[in-house]
UniProtKB/Swiss-Prot annotation:
Record's cofactor remark: Binds 1 Mg(2+) ion per subunit.
A Pfam family assignment: Ligase_CoA
Chemical reaction(s) catalysed: succinate + ATP + CoA = succinyl-CoA + ADP + phosphate; GTP + succinate + CoA = succinyl-CoA + GDP + phosphate
Binding site for substrate: 264, 321-323
Protein's recorded name: Succinate--CoA ligase [ADP-forming] subunit beta
Amino acid sequence: MNLHEYQSKQLFADYGLPVSTGFACDTPEEVAAKAKEIGGDKWVVKAQVHAGGRGKAGGVKLVDTPEDAAAFAKKWLGKQLVTFQTDEHGQPVSKILVETCTDIAKELYLSAVLDRASRRVVFMASTEGGVDIETVAEETPEKILKAEIDPLVGAQPYQAREIAFKLGLEGKQVNQFAKIFVGLAKLFVDKDLALIEVNPLVITDTGDLHCLDAKINVDGSALYRHPDIKALDDPSQEDERERRAAEWDLNYVALEGNIGCMVNGAGLAMGTMDLVKLKGGAPANFLDVGGGATKERVTEAFKIILSDDQVKGVLVNIFGGIVRCDLIAEGIIGAVEEVGVTVPVVVRLEGNNAELGSQKLAESGMNIIAAQSFDDAAEQVVKAVGGAA
Protein backbone atom coordinates (compact mmCIF):
# COMPACT_ATOMS: atom_id res chain seq x y z
CA MET A 1 0.00 0.00 0.00
CA ASN A 2 1.40 3.37 -1.03
CA LEU A 3 1.16 6.51 1.09
CA HIS A 4 0.89 10.09 -0.08
CA GLU A 5 3.86 12.38 0.43
CA TYR A 6 2.16 14.33 3.22
CA GLN A 7 1.33 11.09 5.06
CA SER A 8 4.90 9.83 4.69
CA LYS A 9 6.30 13.12 5.98
CA GLN A 10 4.04 12.95 9.02
CA LEU A 11 5.52 9.54 9.84
CA PHE A 12 9.00 10.99 9.32
CA ALA A 13 8.16 13.80 11.75
CA ASP A 14 6.83 11.30 14.29
CA TYR A 15 10.27 9.68 14.26
CA GLY A 16 12.10 12.97 14.68
CA LEU A 17 13.32 13.29 11.10
CA PRO A 18 13.76 16.74 9.52
CA VAL A 19 10.89 17.60 7.14
CA SER A 20 9.36 20.84 5.90
CA THR A 21 6.47 22.46 7.75
CA GLY A 22 3.42 21.83 5.61
CA PHE A 23 -0.29 21.12 5.43
CA ALA A 24 -2.42 18.92 3.17
CA CYS A 25 -5.39 20.97 2.00
CA ASP A 26 -8.72 20.19 0.35
CA THR A 27 -9.66 23.60 -1.08
CA PRO A 28 -7.88 26.59 -2.68
CA GLU A 29 -9.02 28.77 0.22
CA GLU A 30 -7.42 26.40 2.72
CA VAL A 31 -4.19 26.37 0.71
CA ALA A 32 -4.00 30.19 0.83
CA ALA A 33 -4.81 30.26 4.55
CA LYS A 34 -2.19 27.65 5.40
CA ALA A 35 0.44 29.44 3.31
CA LYS A 36 -0.18 32.57 5.40
CA GLU A 37 -0.03 30.49 8.59
CA ILE A 38 3.31 28.98 7.57
CA GLY A 39 4.70 32.43 6.84
CA GLY A 40 7.60 33.49 4.66
CA ASP A 41 7.64 34.83 1.13
CA LYS A 42 7.88 31.60 -0.87
CA TRP A 43 6.05 28.29 -0.69
CA VAL A 44 6.06 24.98 -2.53
CA VAL A 45 2.70 23.52 -3.58
CA LYS A 46 2.45 19.88 -4.60
CA ALA A 47 -0.40 17.82 -6.05
CA GLN A 48 -0.78 14.64 -3.99
CA VAL A 49 -0.93 11.46 -6.09
CA HIS A 50 0.66 8.02 -5.83
CA ALA A 51 3.09 8.60 -8.69
CA GLY A 52 6.50 10.06 -9.36
CA GLY A 53 7.34 12.59 -12.04
CA ARG A 54 4.94 15.20 -10.67
CA GLY A 55 7.34 18.08 -11.19
CA LYS A 56 7.78 17.48 -14.93
CA ALA A 57 4.00 17.10 -15.27
CA GLY A 58 3.31 20.47 -13.63
CA GLY A 59 2.18 18.99 -10.34
CA VAL A 60 4.80 20.81 -8.25
CA LYS A 61 5.32 24.57 -8.24
CA LEU A 62 7.20 27.27 -6.34
CA VAL A 63 4.90 30.23 -5.61
CA ASP A 64 5.48 33.73 -4.23
CA THR A 65 2.05 34.58 -2.84
CA PRO A 66 -0.82 32.77 -1.08
CA GLU A 67 -2.99 33.79 -4.04
CA ASP A 68 -0.68 31.95 -6.44
CA ALA A 69 -0.83 28.91 -4.17
CA ALA A 70 -4.63 29.03 -4.26
CA ALA A 71 -4.57 29.36 -8.06
CA PHE A 72 -2.42 26.23 -8.30
CA ALA A 73 -4.86 24.36 -6.08
CA LYS A 74 -7.81 25.55 -8.15
CA LYS A 75 -6.06 24.28 -11.28
CA TRP A 76 -5.43 20.76 -9.94
CA LEU A 77 -8.01 19.84 -7.31
CA GLY A 78 -10.55 17.47 -8.81
CA LYS A 79 -8.41 16.98 -11.92
CA GLN A 80 -6.28 14.06 -13.15
CA LEU A 81 -2.48 14.36 -13.03
CA VAL A 82 -0.74 12.40 -15.78
CA THR A 83 2.94 11.55 -15.26
CA PHE A 84 5.33 9.04 -16.79
CA GLN A 85 4.41 6.66 -13.97
CA THR A 86 0.63 6.77 -14.53
CA ASP A 87 -1.52 5.52 -17.38
CA GLU A 88 -2.99 7.89 -19.95
CA HIS A 89 -5.86 8.75 -17.61
CA GLY A 90 -3.61 9.83 -14.75
CA GLN A 91 -4.55 9.85 -11.08
CA PRO A 92 -7.07 12.09 -9.31
CA VAL A 93 -5.85 15.01 -7.20
CA SER A 94 -7.89 15.49 -4.04
CA LYS A 95 -5.30 17.19 -1.82
CA ILE A 96 -2.62 19.84 -2.25
CA LEU A 97 0.42 19.93 0.03
CA VAL A 98 1.63 23.46 0.76
CA GLU A 99 4.91 23.74 2.63
CA THR A 100 7.87 25.95 3.36
CA CYS A 101 10.41 26.60 0.64
CA THR A 102 13.82 25.05 1.30
CA ASP A 103 17.01 26.49 -0.16
CA ILE A 104 19.04 23.65 -1.69
CA ALA A 105 22.83 23.49 -1.87
CA LYS A 106 23.09 19.83 -2.88
CA GLU A 107 20.79 16.87 -3.54
CA LEU A 108 21.42 13.32 -2.30
CA TYR A 109 19.48 10.07 -2.49
CA LEU A 110 18.58 7.70 0.35
CA SER A 111 16.26 4.71 0.44
CA ALA A 112 15.60 1.43 2.23
CA VAL A 113 14.08 -1.68 0.68
CA LEU A 114 13.49 -5.28 1.69
CA ASP A 115 16.03 -7.28 -0.30
CA ARG A 116 14.72 -10.82 -0.74
CA ALA A 117 18.10 -12.13 -1.91
CA SER A 118 19.88 -11.23 1.33
CA ARG A 119 16.66 -11.44 3.38
CA ARG A 120 17.52 -8.14 5.01
CA VAL A 121 16.62 -4.49 4.88
CA VAL A 122 19.12 -2.80 2.59
CA PHE A 123 19.85 0.93 2.55
CA MET A 124 20.94 2.59 -0.68
CA ALA A 125 22.47 6.05 -0.92
CA SER A 126 23.91 8.14 -3.71
CA THR A 127 25.25 11.58 -4.48
CA GLU A 128 22.93 11.56 -7.50
CA GLY A 129 19.82 12.87 -5.75
CA GLY A 130 16.73 14.31 -7.40
CA VAL A 131 16.91 11.97 -10.40
CA ASP A 132 15.51 8.56 -11.28
CA ILE A 133 17.58 6.08 -9.25
CA GLU A 134 16.93 3.34 -11.84
CA THR A 135 18.80 5.46 -14.38
CA VAL A 136 21.71 5.87 -11.97
CA ALA A 137 21.77 2.11 -11.29
CA GLU A 138 21.88 1.37 -15.01
CA GLU A 139 24.36 4.01 -16.15
CA THR A 140 26.62 4.54 -13.11
CA PRO A 141 26.03 1.71 -10.61
CA GLU A 142 29.26 2.53 -8.81
CA LYS A 143 27.60 5.69 -7.49
CA ILE A 144 25.12 3.69 -5.40
CA LEU A 145 26.27 2.85 -1.87
CA LYS A 146 24.64 0.00 0.05
CA ALA A 147 24.40 -1.16 3.65
CA GLU A 148 22.67 -4.33 4.86
CA ILE A 149 20.92 -4.18 8.23
CA ASP A 150 21.42 -7.14 10.55
CA PRO A 151 17.93 -7.94 11.89
CA LEU A 152 19.39 -9.06 15.23
CA VAL A 153 21.07 -5.73 16.07
CA GLY A 154 19.34 -3.22 13.78
CA ALA A 155 20.85 -0.24 12.00
CA GLN A 156 24.13 0.87 13.54
CA PRO A 157 25.51 4.43 13.61
CA TYR A 158 28.86 3.22 12.27
CA GLN A 159 27.09 2.06 9.08
CA ALA A 160 25.60 5.51 8.68
CA ARG A 161 28.93 7.23 9.27
CA GLU A 162 30.64 5.03 6.69
CA ILE A 163 28.05 6.00 4.05
CA ALA A 164 28.12 9.65 5.14
CA PHE A 165 31.87 9.91 4.58
CA LYS A 166 31.54 8.29 1.14
CA LEU A 167 28.82 10.82 0.28
CA GLY A 168 31.23 13.63 1.12
CA LEU A 169 29.42 14.75 4.25
CA GLU A 170 31.40 16.40 7.03
CA GLY A 171 31.08 17.91 10.47
CA LYS A 172 27.54 18.08 11.86
CA GLN A 173 26.19 16.53 8.66
CA VAL A 174 27.63 13.13 9.60
CA ASN A 175 25.70 13.01 12.87
CA GLN A 176 22.57 14.32 11.16
CA PHE A 177 22.83 11.59 8.53
CA ALA A 178 23.29 8.96 11.24
CA LYS A 179 20.12 10.16 12.98
CA ILE A 180 18.14 10.01 9.73
CA PHE A 181 19.61 6.60 8.84
CA VAL A 182 18.78 5.00 12.20
CA GLY A 183 15.37 6.71 12.34
CA LEU A 184 14.36 5.44 8.91
CA ALA A 185 15.48 1.93 9.83
CA LYS A 186 13.36 1.99 12.99
CA LEU A 187 10.36 3.32 11.05
CA PHE A 188 10.85 0.61 8.41
CA VAL A 189 10.74 -2.21 10.96
CA ASP A 190 8.13 -0.71 13.29
CA LYS A 191 5.58 -0.17 10.52
CA ASP A 192 6.35 -3.26 8.39
CA LEU A 193 7.34 -1.24 5.35
CA ALA A 194 8.43 -2.51 1.95
CA LEU A 195 10.08 0.72 0.76
CA ILE A 196 11.21 4.10 2.06
CA GLU A 197 12.63 6.62 -0.36
CA VAL A 198 13.94 10.13 0.30
CA ASN A 199 14.63 11.68 -3.09
CA PRO A 200 16.06 14.14 -2.67
CA LEU A 201 17.69 14.23 0.73
CA VAL A 202 19.11 17.73 0.52
CA ILE A 203 21.87 19.75 2.08
CA THR A 204 20.41 23.21 2.73
CA ASP A 205 22.27 26.46 2.26
CA THR A 206 22.97 26.40 6.02
CA GLY A 207 24.64 22.99 5.69
CA ASP A 208 21.88 20.95 7.33
CA LEU A 209 20.34 17.72 6.02
CA HIS A 210 16.64 17.84 5.19
CA CYS A 211 14.14 15.26 3.86
CA LEU A 212 12.66 17.23 0.99
CA ASP A 213 10.52 14.41 -0.40
CA ALA A 214 9.19 11.20 1.11
CA LYS A 215 7.84 8.01 -0.39
CA ILE A 216 6.60 5.02 1.61
CA ASN A 217 5.21 1.66 0.54
CA VAL A 218 3.72 -0.55 3.26
CA ASP A 219 3.68 -4.35 3.14
CA GLY A 220 0.00 -5.06 2.51
CA SER A 221 0.22 -8.43 4.24
CA ALA A 222 1.08 -6.68 7.52
CA LEU A 223 -1.69 -4.07 7.51
CA TYR A 224 -3.75 -6.07 10.00
CA ARG A 225 -1.09 -5.14 12.57
CA HIS A 226 -1.31 -1.44 11.76
CA PRO A 227 -4.91 -0.16 11.68
CA ASP A 228 -3.57 3.39 11.94
CA ILE A 229 -1.61 2.92 8.72
CA LYS A 230 -4.46 1.09 6.98
CA ALA A 231 -6.68 4.09 7.70
CA LEU A 232 -4.37 6.20 5.50
CA ASP A 233 -5.25 4.21 2.37
CA ASP A 234 -6.58 6.28 -0.54
CA PRO A 235 -8.64 3.97 -2.80
CA SER A 236 -9.01 6.71 -5.42
CA GLN A 237 -5.34 6.19 -6.36
CA GLU A 238 -5.84 2.51 -7.20
CA ASP A 239 -7.12 0.88 -10.35
CA GLU A 240 -10.84 0.29 -9.74
CA ARG A 241 -10.69 -3.31 -10.96
CA GLU A 242 -7.67 -4.09 -8.80
CA ARG A 243 -9.43 -2.60 -5.77
CA ARG A 244 -12.54 -4.73 -6.35
CA ALA A 245 -10.39 -7.82 -6.83
CA ALA A 246 -8.60 -7.22 -3.53
CA GLU A 247 -11.96 -7.14 -1.73
CA TRP A 248 -12.57 -10.72 -2.96
CA ASP A 249 -8.98 -11.85 -2.32
CA LEU A 250 -8.41 -12.13 -6.07
CA ASN A 251 -4.97 -11.27 -7.42
CA TYR A 252 -5.64 -9.03 -10.42
CA VAL A 253 -3.32 -6.86 -12.49
CA ALA A 254 -4.65 -4.94 -15.48
CA LEU A 255 -2.74 -5.20 -18.77
CA GLU A 256 -3.34 -3.77 -22.25
CA GLY A 257 -4.52 -6.73 -24.35
CA ASN A 258 -7.97 -8.02 -25.33
CA ILE A 259 -7.98 -11.57 -23.90
CA GLY A 260 -9.16 -11.83 -20.31
CA CYS A 261 -7.45 -14.57 -18.29
CA MET A 262 -8.87 -16.35 -15.25
CA VAL A 263 -6.56 -18.94 -13.72
CA ASN A 264 -6.04 -20.70 -10.38
CA GLY A 265 -2.44 -20.38 -9.28
CA ALA A 266 0.04 -17.57 -9.93
CA GLY A 267 2.53 -19.77 -11.80
CA LEU A 268 -0.14 -21.20 -14.08
CA ALA A 269 -1.50 -17.69 -14.61
CA MET A 270 1.88 -16.43 -15.79
CA GLY A 271 2.30 -19.48 -18.01
CA THR A 272 -1.15 -18.87 -19.47
CA MET A 273 -0.29 -15.29 -20.36
CA ASP A 274 2.98 -16.42 -21.94
CA LEU A 275 1.24 -19.03 -24.10
CA VAL A 276 -1.48 -16.60 -25.19
CA LYS A 277 1.26 -14.19 -26.25
CA LEU A 278 3.13 -17.00 -28.02
CA LYS A 279 0.00 -17.84 -30.01
CA GLY A 280 -0.31 -14.25 -31.22
CA GLY A 281 -2.75 -12.95 -28.63
CA ALA A 282 -2.49 -10.23 -26.01
CA PRO A 283 -3.54 -10.81 -22.38
CA ALA A 284 -5.83 -8.16 -20.90
CA ASN A 285 -4.97 -9.06 -17.34
CA PHE A 286 -3.36 -11.34 -14.80
CA LEU A 287 -6.01 -12.88 -12.54
CA ASP A 288 -5.36 -15.62 -10.01
CA VAL A 289 -8.56 -16.83 -8.33
CA GLY A 290 -6.52 -18.97 -5.94
CA GLY A 291 -7.45 -22.36 -4.58
CA GLY A 292 -10.99 -21.44 -3.58
CA ALA A 293 -12.51 -21.07 -7.03
CA THR A 294 -16.12 -20.93 -5.81
CA LYS A 295 -19.05 -19.82 -7.95
CA GLU A 296 -19.13 -16.49 -6.12
CA ARG A 297 -15.44 -15.81 -6.70
CA VAL A 298 -15.62 -16.94 -10.33
CA THR A 299 -18.66 -14.69 -10.86
CA GLU A 300 -16.88 -11.70 -9.38
CA ALA A 301 -13.78 -12.51 -11.44
CA PHE A 302 -15.89 -12.47 -14.62
CA LYS A 303 -17.39 -9.12 -13.63
CA ILE A 304 -13.96 -7.63 -13.05
CA ILE A 305 -12.53 -8.98 -16.31
CA LEU A 306 -15.51 -7.84 -18.38
CA SER A 307 -15.51 -4.35 -16.85
CA ASP A 308 -12.54 -3.80 -19.18
CA ASP A 309 -14.04 -2.66 -22.49
CA GLN A 310 -10.99 -3.97 -24.36
CA VAL A 311 -11.77 -7.62 -23.50
CA LYS A 312 -13.05 -9.53 -26.56
CA GLY A 313 -12.69 -13.05 -25.17
CA VAL A 314 -11.98 -14.87 -21.90
CA LEU A 315 -9.69 -17.83 -21.26
CA VAL A 316 -10.38 -19.82 -18.08
CA ASN A 317 -7.53 -22.19 -17.23
CA ILE A 318 -8.12 -24.33 -14.14
CA PHE A 319 -6.06 -27.14 -12.66
CA GLY A 320 -8.20 -29.15 -10.26
CA GLY A 321 -6.22 -30.54 -7.37
CA ILE A 322 -8.20 -30.51 -4.16
CA VAL A 323 -10.95 -28.59 -5.94
CA ARG A 324 -13.07 -30.76 -8.27
CA CYS A 325 -13.27 -29.62 -11.89
CA ASP A 326 -16.97 -30.53 -12.18
CA LEU A 327 -17.79 -28.13 -9.35
CA ILE A 328 -15.66 -25.46 -10.98
CA ALA A 329 -17.50 -26.06 -14.27
CA GLU A 330 -20.82 -25.52 -12.48
CA GLY A 331 -19.45 -22.30 -11.06
CA ILE A 332 -18.32 -21.12 -14.50
CA ILE A 333 -21.71 -21.93 -16.04
CA GLY A 334 -23.53 -20.13 -13.25
CA ALA A 335 -21.22 -17.14 -13.49
CA VAL A 336 -21.55 -16.85 -17.28
CA GLU A 337 -25.33 -17.03 -16.92
CA GLU A 338 -25.52 -14.50 -14.07
CA VAL A 339 -23.11 -11.98 -15.56
CA GLY A 340 -24.56 -12.30 -19.05
CA VAL A 341 -21.26 -12.89 -20.79
CA THR A 342 -21.48 -12.10 -24.51
CA VAL A 343 -17.84 -12.59 -25.52
CA PRO A 344 -16.40 -16.05 -26.32
CA VAL A 345 -15.30 -18.04 -23.27
CA VAL A 346 -12.70 -20.79 -23.66
CA VAL A 347 -12.27 -23.16 -20.71
CA ARG A 348 -9.50 -25.66 -20.11
CA LEU A 349 -9.96 -28.01 -17.17
CA GLU A 350 -7.29 -30.45 -16.02
CA GLY A 351 -7.07 -32.70 -12.99
CA ASN A 352 -9.71 -33.92 -10.53
CA ASN A 353 -12.96 -34.78 -12.42
CA ALA A 354 -11.80 -32.83 -15.49
CA GLU A 355 -13.74 -35.03 -17.96
CA LEU A 356 -16.98 -34.60 -16.04
CA GLY A 357 -16.38 -30.87 -15.86
CA SER A 358 -15.80 -30.64 -19.62
CA GLN A 359 -18.97 -32.66 -20.22
CA LYS A 360 -21.02 -30.25 -18.13
CA LEU A 361 -19.62 -27.31 -20.08
CA ALA A 362 -20.46 -28.99 -23.41
CA GLU A 363 -24.02 -29.73 -22.28
CA SER A 364 -24.67 -26.27 -20.86
CA GLY A 365 -25.89 -24.85 -24.17
CA MET A 366 -23.95 -21.67 -23.50
CA ASN A 367 -21.26 -19.93 -25.53
CA ILE A 368 -18.49 -21.83 -23.75
CA ILE A 369 -15.73 -23.59 -25.68
CA ALA A 370 -14.24 -26.60 -23.88
CA ALA A 371 -10.57 -26.87 -24.87
CA GLN A 372 -8.83 -30.23 -25.13
CA SER A 373 -5.45 -29.06 -23.84
CA PHE A 374 -3.53 -26.04 -22.60
CA ASP A 375 -2.14 -25.42 -26.08
CA ASP A 376 -5.56 -25.85 -27.66
CA ALA A 377 -7.10 -23.40 -25.18
CA ALA A 378 -4.66 -20.64 -26.11
CA GLU A 379 -5.16 -21.25 -29.83
CA GLN A 380 -8.95 -21.29 -29.46
CA VAL A 381 -9.19 -18.00 -27.57
CA VAL A 382 -6.77 -16.19 -29.89
CA LYS A 383 -8.78 -17.46 -32.87
CA ALA A 384 -12.05 -16.42 -31.20
CA VAL A 385 -10.95 -12.80 -30.77
CA GLY A 386 -9.39 -12.59 -34.21
CA GLY A 387 -5.73 -12.50 -33.22
CA ALA A 388 -3.72 -9.92 -31.31
CA ALA A 389 -5.14 -6.67 -29.96
